[in-house]
């Protein structure tokens, strides 16, 4: 039925166009001779037109191609119709012609035959063969046309030289430029035809097929900037311009039998290449853009590192980059889930940028302040209740003038150690990074409730590798309160930590020791035995017993309240930055006497909010002197052992009396954590 309709279409079409006779009666199997005759006839027509006019426009050349395509398409349809209608024909001829397409069919254009008819007539292998033969024949005709034009130019040069009237080189250059522009237009028409075929779904080019015949088109002659070099007499004196063109690699006088045997000139046109986007959508790009994308990422990918996928929440192991690219195209294609993850990552980046802007502004203000003379300080010196009779306890003077650089007026130093986040020469790296939990307690006591914070930034903590600014006790309590029956096993608490926070998923599991430590330490967590085993509940009254801490009560709570009020604005990044940027005056030997240097040794750089008891130094029994009040304001804080020391040693070190040890164990800070638990 399909072949009959095609035959009726061909018979009803006009057959007497431009001297081309009807071929409806030629239904026999002589396709090879007819094809060869047609191709040679078309070549003669092109040659005759070129000889008569001297130049041929792209429209005329396209007109010849359309005529030839119409004629051969009719012949091809009639041959197939006759082959299918006569079952007595041998099947070997049909199998041989299944892939082979007559050469002249390659000149078919979308205006002559619709895509639906091409899909009905030709199989996919025939479409591939059709495209290749079309490119080969187009290239062959272009090269013949180019050869004729060069021969005409050569003859004109010889005749003008013999007549003694040399034509100006500018005129020859303009003529050559016009001819090259015609070639470029033909090449663009061919590329547009290929793209139209691909958009209509008729053909899917492989990269080697797409870049094969197109590379043989002469691109060096298309560039107008190369024309002045061609006409500057680069050849021998008296040599015609045609020979100089040949030296540039543009000699196309030698013809080849097939289009596949053409040698590529030095400069070739950019081939079409298929580049697959990461979400699996193919697109057609030029080789220049494709090569630039490969130069940016020669052997790496931003989402691939250490053998695993860095897509948020994925962590799929991939052996090499090729397997990762395959995983990226299949698992993280353009869908709703990936789009939502991208939106979450955008929010993470925005929050980090806002935080970075705030910290940068704070740093600029600090640097501007440290390079200026201090203004008149407001006196604020109110000593807290020191314990009388304990000679080993020293006063810590917090002075704003302790941070001044060289060249500024500085108050005289005393035997007391100034609480500044500097790094003494004898302080090791272990003590610098050992007080991580302490630097978060002061700010955590006065922040918003953990439930509202987690509700607002749930996606942020779930996907970003950022440690949550909460204590383990508050996190354990929140995990238990979120359950309907208000009880969890230890394994369920671990699962809540890893489910809610990406930090605990991606770091080492030392935090589990801290969870167990806090569960056994605080009286608010009650262990209950039931049918499932041991579960943990929260005694809310016990948890809220000392929150917020009151000024009257344990000296530890008083110390934490004052340190939180004084240094609540100093977060971890601020103190770490100050510790690394050591000023010359603070590191000078004149800043620290032997007593203050020895008392600084057990201090870590981030224990501003929780001072540690210093080691006794020589002559430290006498009370230290205070800094002059006209230069600084002092906050005198009684030093106590750090909470980490309380966890390891209940008694005070070196025989010093510990007031907090005399009280009951529940007077300890509720937010006490495992010592040295800070994760890298």
UniProtKB/Swiss-Prot annotation:
Zn finger limits (C2H2-type): 307-332
Sequence segments annotated as region (Leucine-zipper): 349-370
Biased composition (Polar residues): 1-17, 276-286, 617-635
Residues with PTM Phosphoserine: 52, 86, 554
Comment on protein domains: The leucine-zipper is required for dimerization and transcriptional repression.
Assembly behavior: Forms homodimers and heterodimers with FOXP1 and FOXP2. Dimerization is required for DNA-binding.
Name the UniProt record assigns to this protein: Forkhead box protein P4
Gene designation: FOXP4
């Amino acid at each position: 039925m399909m072949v009959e309709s095609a035959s009726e279409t061909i018979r009803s079409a006009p057959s007497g166009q431009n001297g081309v006779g009807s071929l409806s009666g030629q239904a026999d199997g002589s396709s090879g001779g007819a094809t060869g005759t047609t191709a040679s006839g078309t070549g003669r027509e092109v040659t005759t037109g070129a000889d008569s006019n001297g130049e041929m426009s792209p429209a005329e050349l396209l007109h010849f191609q359309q005529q030839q395509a119409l004629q051969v398409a009719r012949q091809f349809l009639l041959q197939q119709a006759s082959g299918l209608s006569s079952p007595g024909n041998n099947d070997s001829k049909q199998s041989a012609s299944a892939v082979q397409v007559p050469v002249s069919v390659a000149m078919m254009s979308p205006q002559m035959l619709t895509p639906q008819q091409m899909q009905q007539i030709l199989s996919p292998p025939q479409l591939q063969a059709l495209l290749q033969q079309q490119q080969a024949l187009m290239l062959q005709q272009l090269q013949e046309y180019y050869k004729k034009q060069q021969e005409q130019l050569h003859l004109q040069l010889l005749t003008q030289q013999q007549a003694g009237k040399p034509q100006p080189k500018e005129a020859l250059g303009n003529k050559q430029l016009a001819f090259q522009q015609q070639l470029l237009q033909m090449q663009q028409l061919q590329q547009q035809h290929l793209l139209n075929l691909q958009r209509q779904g008729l053909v899917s080019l492989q990269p080697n097929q797409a870049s094969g015949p197109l590379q043989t088109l002469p691109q060096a002659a298309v560039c107008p900037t190369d024309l002045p070099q061609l006409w500057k007499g680069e050849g021998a004196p008296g040599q015609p311009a045609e020979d100089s063109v040949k030296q540039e690699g543009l000699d196309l006088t030698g013809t080849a039998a097939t289009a596949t045997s053409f040698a590529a000139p030095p400069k070739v046109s950019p081939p079409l290449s298929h580049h697959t986007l990461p979400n699996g959508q193919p697109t057609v790009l030029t080789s220049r853009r494709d090569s630039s994308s490969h130069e940016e990422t020669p052997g790496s990918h931003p989402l691939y590192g250490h053998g695993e996928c860095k897509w948020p929440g994925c962590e799929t192991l991939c052996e090499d980059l090729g397997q990762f690219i395959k995983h990226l195209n299949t698992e993280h294609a353009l869908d709703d889930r990936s789009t939502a993850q991208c939106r979450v990552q955008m929010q993470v980046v925005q929050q980090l940028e806002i935080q970075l802007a705030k910290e940068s502004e704070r740093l600029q203000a600090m640097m501007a302040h440290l390079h200026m003379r201090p203004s008149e300080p407001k006196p604020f010196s109110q000593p807290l209740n020191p314990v009388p009779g304990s000679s080993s306890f020293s006063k810590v003077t917090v002075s704003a003038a302790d941070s001044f650089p060289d060249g500024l007026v500085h108050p005289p130093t005393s035997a007391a150690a100034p609480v500044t986040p500097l790094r003494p020469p004898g302080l090791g790296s272990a003590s610098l990074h050992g007080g991580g939990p302490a630097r978060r307690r002061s700010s955590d006591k006065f922040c918003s409730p953990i439930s509202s914070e987690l509700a607002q930034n749930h996606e942020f903590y779930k996907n970003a590798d950022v440690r949550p600014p909460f204590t383990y006790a508050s996190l354990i309590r929140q995990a238990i309160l979120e359950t309907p029956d208000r009880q969890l096993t230890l394994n369920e608490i671990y699962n809540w930590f890893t489910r809610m926070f990406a930090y605990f998923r991606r770091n080492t599991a030392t935090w589990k020791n801290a969870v167990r430590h806090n569960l056994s330490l605080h009286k608010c967590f009650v262990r209950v035995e039931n049918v499932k085993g041991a579960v943990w509940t929260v005694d809310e009254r016990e948890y809220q017993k000392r929150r917020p801490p009151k000024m009257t009560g344990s000296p530890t709570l008083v110390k934490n309240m004052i340190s939180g009020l004084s240094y609540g604005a100093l977060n971890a990044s601020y103190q770490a930055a100050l510790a690394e940027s050591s000023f010359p005056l603070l590191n000078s030997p004149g800043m620290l006497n032997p007593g203050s240097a020895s008392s600084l040794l057990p201090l870590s750089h981030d224990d501003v909010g929780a001072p540690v008891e210093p080691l006794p130094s020589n002559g430290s029994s006498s009370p230290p002197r205070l800094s002059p009040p006209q230069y600084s304001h002092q906050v005198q804080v009684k030093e106590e052992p750090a909470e980490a020391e309380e966890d390891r040693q209940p008694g005070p070190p070196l025989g010093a009396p510990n007031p907090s040890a005399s009280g009951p164990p529940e007077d300890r800070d509720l937010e006490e954590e495992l010592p040295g638990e800070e994760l890298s």
